[in-house]
Curated annotation (Swiss-Prot):
Protein name: Dynein axonemal assembly factor 3 homolog
Gene Ontology cellular component list: cytosol; dynein axonemal particle
Keyword Cell wall biogenesis/degradation: no
Annotated region (Disordered), positions in chain: 480-499
Organism of this sequence: Drosophila melanogaster (Fruit fly)
Keywords per UniProt: Cilium biogenesis/degradation, Cytoplasm
Protein family per UniProt: Belongs to the DNAAF3 family.
Tissue: Expressed in mechanosensory chordotonal (Ch) neurons, spermatocytes and spermatids (at protein level).
Length: 540
């Protein structure tokens, strides 16, 4: 609910790949690059509308924008973010603001660690807490003042939010402020959730944690997650740990269901994920294969280190629009190191006076607009509301939004469009439930007229997503066998009785071999002299 359980995608790249649109990488030479960009200017792919339903975090937005510079064809992107409540959308706005924070405020490593802290830790560093509060005040000005929004982040569009959702944004940003009455005892909420989930197994929870990781998540693509970081997250809610940091402040961006009660707030406590973790979005794979090295199941690098490396790449590309070269000395090999996990510190709320103000304009990303959509529109999309018809070129939907999927939903997709559905692969649910979910989803999309963008019948693998496309072209659906296999020389005649299985071998016919080949002809005579072949009957 508060983070996705699938890896970040470059949604534009997925679209190009699904429809086999040629988009050669831009050359490194500056003159050749300019010529290629001019040649791509007349391309008919001018605008793409992208809908992200229940993304829970801005991982797809960040990667899509970061990799935008690599494409020769760069259409205008309209990205629509639709989540279940205003607090999650406010959190997404904050995380997107961190990714696009002015470079004068933070260096690359500090920005990455700040993002990781706010993104995946229930208890955060004091510096992250200060940023959350100060940035919350800036975001509050943005959602209540159109001029301030255009000055700081003109790429954001909140016209799709109703006044109720804007009030929800205002309550979230206000709740983040360090006031004594804004209480969020996340450590207590976390323990309550864990006790309720495990029941009588709580006293032996370390064994339950190891089982979920070793027997489930690692078997489904989570090999990069180390047991120490996973157990510590399951115990405390702190996923990303570095030895030089101490965590003592509650991460109030995880609070949902805020309701005013005088100057105080009532909320639902912590209702997010407590089984998979925030490792999937950026921490499962990286382009540097050396970082996936492991010995007897012990990784050299943690999912935390992979997350750090990937975010440094994306944030560097967002800022410079150039390729990132990773400095190997920055990544610390803590995969097989047993870090001393000290108890979480107590925290004291303090006045907001004297904190830094993060009110500089965001990094400019030309040709991109991010629209925040009212959560109420999810029901309208399910019913096939006319104002959404033929709107989107790319749709991503989280697995927990599957109940909103219907045949009418696909009316919102254009004639040539891509649909990506997150699966339950990286949950700890039983294998049969994961397979049942995939089967139902495939059947629904097939009934709606969508065609698989990947040959799922031929590839017997584990799917983190299901990718289907809607196309107006008369294309043949991929089959399990893509090439016609040569026919057998032996054919059955439906009118012939071949007898019992033991006698079936008498129906074999040896083709006539030219007599010029004396060696083969001699072998043929020996085989015929031995009589018909019989199956072995002396089974143990």
């Amino acid at each position: 609910m508060l983070w996705g359980i699938s890896s970040a995608l470059d949604l534009y790249e997925e679209y190009l790949r699904a429809f086999k649109i040629k988009d050669d990488p831009l050359p490194e030479d500056e003159h050749a690059r300019e010529e290629a960009e001019e040649a791509a200017g007349d391309n008919t792919l001018n605008t793409l509308n992208i809908l992200i339903c229940g993304g829970a975090d801005p991982r797809h937005v960040i990667k899509t924008l970061a990799k935008r510079y690599t494409h020769r064809i760069r259409p205008k992107l309209n990205i629509y973010l639709l989540d279940g409540c205003a607090e999650i959308e406010a959190r997404n706005m904050l995380l997107l603001g961190v990714a696009l924070e002015d470079p004068e405020s933070f260096n690359l490593v500090s920005k990455v660690h700040l993002f990781m802290d706010l993104y995946g830790n229930a208890v955060i560093r004091p510096s992250s807490h200060h940023y959350m509060a100060a940035k919350g005040r800036t975001l509050l000005k943005m959602v209540t003042n159109e001029e301030e929004l255009q000055r700081l982040a003109p790429m954001l569009n909140i016209e799709g939010l109703k006044y109720k959702e804007r009030d929800g944004f205002e309550m979230a940003f206000t709740f983040w402020q360090p006031q004594p009455w804004n209480v969020f005892e996340v450590t207590a909420y976390w323990e309550q959730r864990s006790r309720a989930l495990l029941g009588t197994r709580y006293d032996h929870r370390n064994g339950a944690f190891d089982w979920d990781l070793s027997m489930t998540l690692k078997e489904r693509g989570g090999q990069q997650i180390c047991s120490q970081e996973y157990r510590y997250w399951r115990e405390t809610g702190v996923a990303f740990v570095f030895p030089e940091y101490e965590h003592c402040k509650p991460n109030k961006t995880l609070a949902v269901g805020l309701v005013r009660n005088g100057r105080n707030f009532i909320h639902r406590g912590y209702v997010g994920d407590i089984q998979t973790g925030p490792f999937c979005g950026f921490g499962l794979r990286t382009v540097e294969e050396r970082m996936h090295h492991s010995v007897h199941g012990d990784n050299d690098y943690r999912a935390t280190d992979i997350t750090e490396r990937n975010l440094m790449e994306f944030f560097h590309e967002l800022l410079t629009q150039t390729a990132y070269e990773h400095d190997t000395t920055r990544s610390r090999r803590y995969g097989s190191v047993q870090l001393l996990m000290t108890p979480l510190l107590n925290h004291q709320e303090e006045d907001a006076a004297g904190q830094a103000a993060y009110d500089k304009p965001w990094i400019h990303v030309p040709g991109v607009t991010v629209h925040f959509v009212s959560p109420m529109e999810m029901e309208q999309l399910k019913k096939g509301a006319a104002h959404w018809n033929n709107m989107f070129d790319i749709v991503f939907m989280a697995y927990n939004y599957y109940s909103f999927l219907s045949k009418d939903f696909f009316q919102a997709m254009r004639a040539q469009s891509l649909f990506i559905l997150e699966t339950k692969l990286m949950t700890v649910e039983r294998k049969d439930r994961v397979q049942e979910y995939e089967s139902k989803a495939k059947e629904l999309m097939k009934d709606a007229g969508l065609k698989a963008a990947i040959n799922y019948q031929a590839i017997n693998g584990k799917n983190m997503w299901l990718k289907y496309k809607k196309t107006d072209k008369d294309e043949q659906e991929d089959e399990a066998v893509t090439e016609a296999m040569p026919e057998s020389t032996f054919k059955y005649d439906t009118d012939t009785d071949y007898g019992e299985p033991a006698e079936e071998y008498t129906g074999l016919v040896i083709e006539e071999i030219p007599s010029s080949n004396q060696t083969v002809a001699a072998i043929k005579k020996e085989v015929e002299a031995e009589g018909p072949l019989q199956p072995k009957t002396n089974f143990p």
